[in-house]
Structures are given as C-alpha cells and as structure tokens.
Amino acid sequence: MEFSGRKWRKLRLAGDQRNASYPHCLQFYLQPPSENISLIEFENLAIDRVKLLKSVENLGVSYVKGTEQYQSKLESELRKLKFSYRENLEDEYEPRRRDHISHFILRLAYCQSEELRRWFIQQEMDLLRFRFSILPKDKIQDFLKDSQLQFEAISDEEKTLREQEIVASSPSLSGLKLGFESIYKIPFADALDLFRGRKVYLEDGFAYVPLKDIVAIILNEFRAKLSKALALTARSLPAVQSDERLQPLLNHLSHSYTGQDYSTQGNVGKISLDQIDLLSTKSFPPCMRQLHKALRENHHLRHGGRMQYGLFLKGIGLTLEQALQFWKQEFIKGKMDPDKFDKGYSYNIRHSFGKEGKRTDYTPFSCLKIILSNPPSQGDYHGCPFRHSDPELLKQKLQSYKISPGGISQILDLVKGTHYQVACQKYFEMIHNVDDCGFSLNHPNQFFCESQRILNGGKDIKKEPIQPETPQPKPSVQKTKDASSALASLNSSLEMDMEGLEDYFSEDS
C-alpha cells in the first residue's frame, strides 16, 4: 500500500467504460479497486459502509426479511447513504463505485477476528439477498456470468421436456407456475443442500433449480468466497497496520460509534436536579436507570459507574455546577467527608467537563462503547444490562419495570441472539407504547432525547446535527490518536493508492 503527495485524482472513464466497470447494482467483489482516493474519502466511505451494515443488522432483527416493510426501509437506507440498490437508475456509477471501494475497506477492518468476520459476512449476505431480490429477471443471467457462476437458464423447450420431473422435485411448483419460473442448470456440487433436502431434480451431473431456490445457492457461493478472502486479508493485515495513518482507523472502525456524540448541549441547564428521579423512570435507558437506582440506594458509585452516568447526565443538560452539587449531595449521604469529596471527586467531575488536566471535553458513552469496553465486576453497576446481566436477573428487572410477559420474552430472545441494542430499542417501544420507534438505537442519550420527544409531543429541544463521532473522548488525546483525529491531521492532498490494496486481497500476498 502506498501513499503519496501527488494531486488527488480519481479514475475518470467515458460513459460506456464507466458502466462496464460496474454493470450491476450488486456484485461478488471479485476484484479489489485500483484507483487512488484521498484519505478523507477512505474514512468517509468506511463510516458510511458501517452505518449501512448496522442498518441491515437492525432491520433484519426488527422485520421479517423480504417483507414489504423490510425492503422499503432498507432501500431507504441505501438511498440515504448513496449506495447502489437498483438497476436502470440514472448515474449509478458513483453509488456503485462507493459500494465497491467501501466493501474492500471494511474487509481490512473486519478480518481481524472470527467474531468480526462472522458479523461482516452475515450483513453482506443479507445486503446481497436484498439486491438480488429486486434485480430484473433479464439481468440475472448477466450477473451470474459476471460473478463467475456457471449457472445457466434453460430454454422453454428444455423446461417443457423436463416439466414433470422438475415439478415433482419442487413442492412449491406446479405446471402452471413453471411456465412463469426461470429454471437454472447448475453443477450438482453447487446444489448439495437442495439435494440433501430432496428439493431438486438431478440429471447427468446437473441440478435443475427454480429461480426462487437459486438465491440460497448464490448466497452460499458468496459466503464461501468472502470467507476465504477475509482469511487471506487477515494474513496480510500486519503490513497494512504498519502504516501509522491507517492503523488508528482500522483498529477503531469495527467498534466505533458513527452517530451524534451529544456533546453539543443545546439544553444546558434545562434539567433541574429535582427532575432526575422522575426522568430516570420515564426516559432513562435501563443502563442509566440502574446506575441512578444504585447511586440513590448506596450513595456511591465506582469509577466506571461515575464516568458512564456522569457523562450521560452531562449530555442531557446538567451544568458543571449542577453535577458537582448532585454528586456531592449523594456522596455525603454515604457518610463521606465533604472535604474529601472536594479534594478528590470534584476534580474528576471538572475534568470530565474539560475544566482540568488536558482540558478534554469528554462525550457521553455510546451503546457500543458501553457494550464492548470495561465490563462490570462484582459491586459495579455500569455496563449494559442486556449484555452484562444474567438472563434471570434481567427478567426480574424487566418485570419490575412493568414489561409484559410477552414483551419480556421478545427482549430475552433478542438478547440470546446478541442483539443488545435492538433489545433496548424493543424496551423503548414497550414503555412508550409505540409499535415502531422509527430509529435505530445507538446511544443512551438518543434514548433520552427520543423519549422526551414522545412524552412532550415533539416539543423537546432538538440538538443541532454534528459530525459523526469517533471513539471517546473527542480530541486526539485519547490513548494514541483516535481514528478521526489521526486522519484529520493529514494533509488533505495525500492520497491512497488503491492498486496497492490488491496485495492484501489476493492469494499471492
């Protein structure tokens, strides 16, 4: 991989050449990109792809895949993030280019562990399934050929000749349906799953597969190719990570939160200390609700709890003076000497507001940060209840929150499937009595803001939109350099030679 200071350029192609580069709205990503892009575009494409795949995950849990609602919402996300989704749309080159490059960027970030690879493959498969489902029938054969799949649609004459055998082997087909259904001739080895289920007609080493069943075979091929490609990329990853300009981004990308950071406090001072107890039961997510309850009962929280809860309170509008008063009043109830609080704990509170030390204005923790870092130990109350609680204790907690038995079962099923944020979103919908909250939950402060918007009839203070957040804290003093600050500090004229990436995606590396 090479970087240079040459003037940034993109591959410029004439109309026909551009279309030839990306003939379809979906692909198997067989060839890595070979153009130069700026590091800023590299970062932006990566962030947008993460947003897209997380939307794919959330929608796949919230809706039945393939339903009209699922299709409509996923298409909306693709449109919003400017990725390709349909054939025959005008000026599709740029969305398809973004799709191609961003996929390979995320391979670098998500090849680093088995868990990351598994998640990445599943979301990419679901995305491919959606795109294939809306691919016009007259484009399918070309797509299969471009994807190097030896699947060929048989002629009407062949279909008529084998009609009886095909219908007998495919329970959902009738003679009438067969007339409108494309049948594909596929090598037997590629249709083993259908053969095991006795759902396919075999003849001379070939399987005759209806279009409705070919999707599973295509997805299996895609999974196998992508899994192998990620393993090859992982072998070459040390060479990529040796570049100090890419290493921070790749290390943080798979675990980064890309939404609003809730550090811009348009509602500073709008929350009074007297309101917190009531707000904790009405508008706090379970992670903050349990921290508030523990603080009121024990008059103390350990460092992890103070950081998680303190920054959340800061994000919903508590001023520095209010925060000092809130924590001091509570800790003194626990028999702490006021002087000890002033000399020790008050410094940490001022520090979190950017008034001490390196003057870092810390941002509230996102769901991903809470889920993935600093798990609670005995005596701790921080963390995510859906991720870190014993299922039976979580069930009891939900019962105390007056969640219905059916609702508790839904939430526990989501937790069992490791969909912790979706479980919290389901909790939000239940306590606010809404069927669809209309957003993907990614942040405790988002939970609070959306709750207040519902309870106040949409009249709560809306925060100004800000740039995507990178791992906390905001400035580049955290650990080494966070992903955004590392890239932002580079001269924007630097470019990345995408041709160099080929070494990391091929078997010869």
Curated annotation (Swiss-Prot):
Keywords: 4Fe-4S, DNA replication, DNA-binding, Iron, Iron-sulfur, Metal-binding, Phosphoprotein, Primosome. The modification Phosphothreonine is found at residue 470. Residues 461-486 are annotated as: Disordered. SUPFAM superfamilies: PriB N-terminal domain-like. Changing residue 104 to A: Decreases primase affinity for POLA1 by 40-fold. Its cofactor is [4Fe-4S] cluster. Gene3D superfamilies: 1.20.930.80. [4Fe-4S] cluster binds at residues 287, 367, 384, 424. Residues 300-442 are annotated as: RNA:DNA duplex-binding. Regulatory subunit of the DNA primase complex and component of the DNA polymerase alpha complex (also known as the alpha DNA polymerase-primase complex) which play an essential role in the initiation of DNA synthesis. During the S phase of the cell cycle, the DNA polymerase alpha complex (composed of a catalytic subunit POLA1, an accessory subunit POLA2 and two primase subunits, the catalytic subunit PRIM1 and the regulatory subunit PRIM2) is recruited to DNA at the replicative forks via direct interactions with MCM10 and WDHD1. Belongs to the eukaryotic-type primase large subunit family. This is DNA primase large subunit.
